[in-house]
Structure formats: C-alpha cells, structure tokens
Amino acid sequence: MSEGNDQDAGKGRLSLRPAGRMELGRTVDAGSVRQSFSHGRSKVVQVEVRKKRGLQPGTPSAPEGGSSSAPAPQSGNAPQGTPRSGGGNRGSGRGGAGGAGRALTAQELAIRQRVLEQQRVEAARREVERREQEKISILSAAEEARRREEEAKRAAEEEARRKEQEEADRIAAEAARKAAESAPPAEAPPVPPPAQRERTAAPSSRSAPSRTAPSDDIRRPSRPAPIPSKVPVAAPSAPQTLRLRERGDEGEEERKPRRAGGGGAPAPRKAAAPVAKKAVAEPRRGGRIDVRAAIEGEDERTRSIASMRRQRDRERRQAELERLRADQLKVVRDVVLPETIAVGELANRMAVRAADVIKQLMRMGMMATVTQTIDADTAELVVQEFGHRVRRVSESDVEVGLEGISDIDSDLQPRPPVVTVMGHVDHGKTSLLDALRATDVAAGEAGGITQHIGAYQVTLPSRQKLTFLDTPGHEAFTAMRSRGASVTDIVVLVVAADDGVMPQTIEAIKHAKAANAPIIVAINKCDKPGANPGRVRQELLHHEIVVEDMGGDTQDVEVSALKRQNLDKLEEAILLQAEVLDLKANPDRAAEGTVVESRLDRGRGPVATVLVQKGTLRQGDIVVAGAEWGRVRAMLDDKGQQMKEALPSTPVEILGLAGVPSAGEPFVAVENESRAREISEFRQRKIREKMAAGIAAGRGTLEQMLSRIQAGAQKEVAVVIKADVQGSAEAIATTVQKQEHEEVKVRTLLSSVGQISESDVQLAKASNAVLIAFNVRATNQARELAQREGVDIRYYSIIYEVADDIEALVRGKIAPKQREKFLGYAEIRKVFEITKVGKVAGCMVTEGVVKRGCGVRLLRDNVVIHTGELSQLKRFKDDVKEVARNYECGLSFAGYNDIKEGDVVECYETELVPA
C-alpha cells in the first residue's frame, strides 16, 4: 500500500496519505468502509467526510492564539466610596474622639433632617420608578410571551414543512438507489496521462468502461459508498476547507477522479441515468455537500436547502406583512348619502363588498338584501362603522341656487306697481277695471261674476304703467285671492257704498294684512240713491282700517265705475302709494315670477299666465313653472299681441310648457334643458308621493274599512272635475270638499283642465263618479261613450250651481233619521196579577194619548227604569188602539213586570225624516 502511494505521488495523482502535500485539516474526519464487489470479494477503503462549519451569526470566532481570557481589572482605579488607607483612618479617629461627648448644634440638626428628608424623597421616587419598571416588565413579558408563542407556531409549521420535504427527498433518494442497484456494474477505464486527460476528460467520463481488465485491484463497485446520515459539525475555531488538488496542478480548474487506495485504477463513476435524473428532477439538491463533491474538488461554499427554505419563509412572511399593512392602510372616502339608498349602491360607494354591508346591518339588528332600500340615518351608521366620511345630500338639492343671488342696489331700476283689486262679489271690481282700461270685460262674464283671475297692464296718460290683477269675489275663490295678495304691491279694496262690508270684504282685508300690502279703499257705487260712504268707513273701523278722513293713514276714494267718477283720483292715489314704496327690480338677470293662472287651450296647448317679478323673460328661454318645464315658444300680452320680451311687473301668457302648471307656483328661467328636466322630475315625484300618502291615509287600515262597510257607513260621492283654467278646477275641488257629511265622503278622483276625453269617462264609469264640466265640453267620442256607459256629465258655467248640485247628491246619500214624537203620560193607579199574562197596570191617562204598540218609558221618582214597548192596551175588557186623556186603561209591558203603584208611563213613537 505504501509503495502504491509513493508511486501515485510520483505520478502526480491524488493520495490519502497524510503527507505534506495533502492535508485534510481540522474540518475533515477520516474513516474506513468495506466495499463489496462481485463474486464475494470485498475491500477496506479510506473515506474522508467534510464537516459543516457551525458558526452562529454574530458570534466572533476565537483568536488563533487559543483560549481567551477576560481583561483583568485595573489596579490603579480604586472603587468609588472606598476609604483610603492612611489619612482616612486617622481623620475618622480624630472625629470620633472629638465628637463623643458633644451635642449636635441646631445647624447640624437641620442639616441632618434635610438629608433625611432628601433620603425619604429619593426612596419614594425609587419606589415609584420600581413600580413603573415592574409594569413595563410585565407588559414586556406578555409581549415576549406572545412573540414566543408566534415564533413557536411558525417553527412548528416550518418543522412540519421540513419533515414533509425530507420525506419527499428520502423517497426520491430511495428511488435513485434502487435504480442504481438495478443497473449493471460499471468498470472504470485506465487513467490517461495528465496531458491527454485534460483533452479527453469530458468524453471519457461519459463513455462506457472496458471490461478487459481482469484484476481485482482495478474493479470498483457501481454504487458509491454509503454516506452517514448525520455529518458532525466542525468546531468554529478553525476556518479551513477541503481542497483536493494534484501535486503539480494546484491551479488547474478541472476536477480529477478520486483514488480509493494504493491501486492505480481510477475512481468509479455513477451510471449516466441516475445522474441525469438527479440533475433534472431535483435541481435544488445540486448545492448539497456530500462525499463525492468533496472528493471531486467542489470546494465552493454553496447554499444548503435549509438556507433556501429559510429565505423562502422570510420572503413569504415579508409578503404577508406587506399585505397586512396594505389592509390596515384603508382609503377613507367621502360617501354621498341621499335620503334613501339601496344596500348594493351603498357598498359600491364605499368600495366594499355588499356581503360586508349586509353583515354590518345584521349586527345592527336589521335584515336586508342587496336590493333593499334603507334610510339615510341607517346608511350613515354603516358608513361610520366602515371608517368613511359621510356627506348627506337631499333630493331637494337640485333646487339649490335656483332663485339666483340677491341684487345689488346699483343694478335696480324702477318698475310699475302691481295692484290687486279685491272685494266682495258684485261690488263692482271688474267694472272698475273696465273703466280704468276702457274695456267691457264684465259684460261677457257668466252670471255677472268673475270666476278667473285676470292680469292687465294699463298705460296712463302720464306714460306711467300700472299692472292690475282682478280676483274673483265669490267665497269659493279664496285661493285665488290669496295668490293675488301674495304677488301684489298695493291692494285696492272695493266696497259698495250701498252694501257695506261683507264676508269676502273681511277675507280680502285679512289676505292683504297677511301679505303686508298697503290698502287703498275704493268706495264704489256712490252714484246710487242708497249710497252711504260714511257707513262704509265706520264698518271698516271694526277691522282696523282707519281712513285718512278719520285720522288714519289709509287712503279712500269715492268712485263710480258706471259713471266713471273720480277715476283719476284713484290713479293718483295708486301712484302716490307706489312712490312711497319705491318699487325697483333688476331687469338684467334671469326671469323669475309667479304663475297667476293656467289652462289647456285646444289649439295652443298648455297656456300659463305669469307675472314677471325679477329679470327679463325672453322668447326662447327655458323655464320651470311648478312641476312643468318647457321652452317659451311665444308670449302674448293681455290684448293678445305678440311680445319678444317681458320686463319686471309685466303679465304675459307663455306657450310651450310640457303641461299645465298649478296656479300660484313660482316660475324661473334656467340655463339648460337638463337642469329644467331634473327639477321638474323631482317636483313631479314629490307630488305623486304626496297624493299616494293622502290616498293611503284616507283609505285607512283594512280593519277600519271592513268595520265601516259592515256598519253601512261606507258611503261616498266620487267626482271627476274638468275646468277651463287651473284656478277654477282648484276652486271647484275646494267647494266639493266642503260638502262632506259625517256619513258621506266626497272624493275627488281627478281635477284637471281641458276637454272631457274618453279616459275621463272611463274613470267615472269605473268608480261610479259624477263628471263635472266647468266651462268645457266633451269630445264627440267621449260624449258617445258616456251615453253608452250611462255616465252622468253635468255642465256648469257658474260655480255656486256646482256647490248646490253636489250638496243635493250628498244629501241623497244620507240615510233618513229617526225622530221621536211625544204622545202622552199615564199614571199607574193599581197593579193586577193575572195568570198567563203577568202583571197589568191600571192607569189613568194624564196627558196626551196612549197608543197600542208605541214606545214607553217607565219612570219611578223621575228616573227612567225601563224602556220598551206596550204589549197590550185595554179599556175594561176590550182591546183598543188608543186611549185619550182623563180615561182609564190597562197596560202591560213586553217582557217586563217590575211595576208599582205611583209609577209614570211616558208614551212616544218614532218617525223617519229626511236628513
């Protein structure tokens, strides 16, 4: 063996002999294993195992000098507080000897007390610090325990993953070993010289070995030697690596085959198939350090599988930490909440899942679905729970900024006054306006009364303009008078000199005071023989109207519309009052005003009479009037002439609206159609909701309806109202509602303007309603349908006729009432007991008559003790129909026998009378 080693050394081959050329160092342990060959042969070979260096991170390696010793304390630095040997003892001795028999002075005592107090304060401070330190220690210990628990949990998970990986590696290694055993044994070829080996290293390692060498020394097993499962770790004190190089080729990069012993045969190689499988199927095992890698010269420090696992675990934990941080950094949003919102829409606005919103609602005790609608308060609580900001909005926000900004004084210009003429019916309001306008409107009015609100503009000889609103005086037109007073600047109160103050005059005074409008009293009909203007002034005092003649500040003018007397004085009074008010408006802005009246014209469609109060209305403007909108296609004045623009205080008729707006609604010009459509849709939706709520409230609960039907009290009169203008339809609806009775309900199914159509007839037929047509007619198709279906269409032109007919209808629905009629009294003089009949009272009729079958009340001491009917009425033994006063008779009561002498019988009968 030694000769072989020397020979190998001389040839420049590897050797395991511990000579000066090859050193294993302190990181390699040597051992021997027995290799088994074919035909029962075996041989002992030497094996070197490279040990893994087990350095802990952060631990410095020991110095090469060997053992390390702690630095000795310096002798020159003495501890603080240690008395010096020498003078200290001497001084102490002197102090002790000098102060043994002397008392402390006051200064020394104060110093000592101060020192003791400082010591107590210091002790208290240290105690507080100790307690705080204990609290911190407890919290730190809890945090450390939690951290250790988490680390233990992670370590357990890593250990489980490691075991699974090791089991997979073991199964793969076992499969590779079985594949290597099943392969035929391979023989190594002879080792070529170094120069030739450098050229043919790669091809020869893959070629099949020759089988012509019969010597046992050169035969090697086909499988490598077993590797110990646990490789001992080298001590960290000697950082050395195993480098196996040829004697003369230390710088050569090519790896040389290993020599097992003294023979010159090359080291055995593994079969090609297992090597390829290992390189392809398990690439992660390429960095593992084994015996073969150490022998072949793979001396670089590569990363182990455990290190790679730790790196992957660190990366996974880092990614998990970043994900958790991303979840914690939530985006706070401004969530806009309307009055009602669906659950799904709320989730979308918060950018969360709808399921999370539903869970939160369930925690709040509310079961909801994705499509269910919740109110704004509940939605606000949910948004706050998710950590977002809430911004509440209302559907009415679409009207914000609709009226524009306030005008500045420099933009204001004088405007004509708006004068409303009010008063009682038939006091001459329209005639007075006709006299001022030089027209004859009153002659064409039905019934001689005004039933529409009219708007006119008069130009005086002085070129000044006055705008007049003529309001109806009938009691049914309260809403019209209220609208006129709300948009007016001056109220002209017309009172007939021969009639005085009447109910509608009082109502007009209240409307004017509510609108805070000044009043000018026009005492009309002063040309009539019975005129008494003084009485009118006296009656006005009862309503706090004090004219100037009586020391007040209210102007009064005695006029005659028929004779056109003092009309100029009335105009002067109006102009004077307007000058006092100093009326101004800004014409250079979007138009605003009020709808005075509206109607549905057959040829022109919806027509609205509006009064411009601010700005200038031009043809082509987009306006919103109440719940309707449209573009102004045409404008007409009170004389029917076309206009291009309307300045403030100008009444005009506008065409082009989508529908008939309600009278009294404001109108405003907007910038575009989308804004107008949005506002109109919002207002129409509000009207529908209000109507639905009113219907539901009027209907009541199902139990209430059933109880009314069973009691026979569910009676109603249904009406469908069609009028020429919106104000008349409104007045008729109000008049109809006033005719209600406690037993009969009057219900207005429809109140609109325009002709009667087939749909109106069908509605009246379905609900058994009366169709009221006020100043309108039915179409031919509607008339024929009404005749076939038997629908009653009633035409009217005067409003009080409508009120009379509806009152008659309601009275016809009321059931007749029972009225009690007194007959007489009878006094019981004697009581008889008769078999099979019971007690019979012998009576004397003291007042009136007693009739058979009448109702009776039995009075005892003026207290009613029984109410019933007479069963028998006899005189002596004969049955009679009635007994007159001062005659005796016998009475018996149906089902009652508790009668005594001295009781009084009151007799009466009931009769039906119409309600």
UniProtKB/Swiss-Prot annotation:
**Which InterPro entries does UniProt cross-reference here?**
EF-G-like_DII, EFTu-like_2, IF2_assoc_dom_bac, IF2_II, IF2_N, P-loop_NTPase, Small_GTP-bd, T_Tr_GTP-bd_dom
Q: Does the keyword Lyase apply?
A: no
Which cell locations does it reside in? Cytoplasm
Segments of this protein annotated with the region G2: 448-452
- Give positions of region: G1: 423-430
Q: Which PROSITE patterns match?
A: G_TR_2, IF2
Q: Where is this region: Disordered?
A: 1-105, 121-295
A GO term, aspect molecular function:
GTPase activity
Keywords linked to the UniProt accession: Cytoplasm, GTP-binding, Initiation factor, Nucleotide-binding, Protein biosynthesis
The region called G3 is annotated at 470-473
Annotated stretches, region: G4:
524-527
Q: Where is the composition biased (Low complexity)?
A: 57-81, 201-213, 230-239, 266-278
Pro residues bias: start-end ranges: 186-195
Chain residues that bind GTP:
423-430, 470-474, 524-527
Quote the PANTHER family the UniProt record gives. Answer: TR-TYPE G DOMAIN-CONTAINING PROTEIN, TRANSLATION INITIATION FACTOR IF-2-RELATED
Q: What does this protein do?
A: One of the essential components for the initiation of protein synthesis. Protects formylmethionyl-tRNA from spontaneous hydrolysis and promotes its binding to the 30S ribosomal subunits. Also involved in the hydrolysis of GTP during the formation of the 70S ribosomal complex.
Family from the record: Belongs to the TRAFAC class translation factor GTPase superfamily. Classic translation factor GTPase family. IF-2 subfamily.
Q: What is this protein called?
A: Translation initiation factor IF-2
Gene assigned in the entry: infB
